Amino acid sequence: MEMNTRIQVEHTVTEEVIDHDLIKEQIKIAAGEKIGKKNYIPMMHAMECRINAEDVFNNFRPTPGTITSFHSPKGHGVRVDTHVYSGYTVSPHYDSMIAKLICRAQTREECIKKMRRALDEFIIDGVKTTIPFHRKLMDDESFQKGKFHTGFLETFNMKDEPKSEKKEKVK
């Protein structure tokens, strides 16, 4: 039997739909406390966009460099997990992840709408990011209807700019 003692990368989405801090719960259990009696039934819709320093128009090639401007979106149902700031240098030697953008809403449609707005408000200058990819994905009709599969991205067209595209500034 295998035991995974780590929390999964996508735990943020689970936390948002059940409205509970899984990291806090995991620490309590490790300290010998009993698992909480919270109702863990999903009550919301949530999705996460991993914002990486990558060039989506060049096969997602990493784009190390210095972030010259960083402004994350805010608002009800919008969460940004990051360690990055203006002046931060994205190294070519490590993971290119800049932030996890998580949005939560009552319905999938509302969640997509909120994610579009949050992506439009997210400002990262100095390196190319995956923000244009996520904007384009939010505009895709198949994605909006939940009609996608594991091979979906192989046929996804990134050549055209997304409707809500804001030009990225790379110096």
Residue ranges with predicted function:
Residues 1-171:
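ATP-dependent carboxylate activation and anion-phosphoryl transfer catalytic cores
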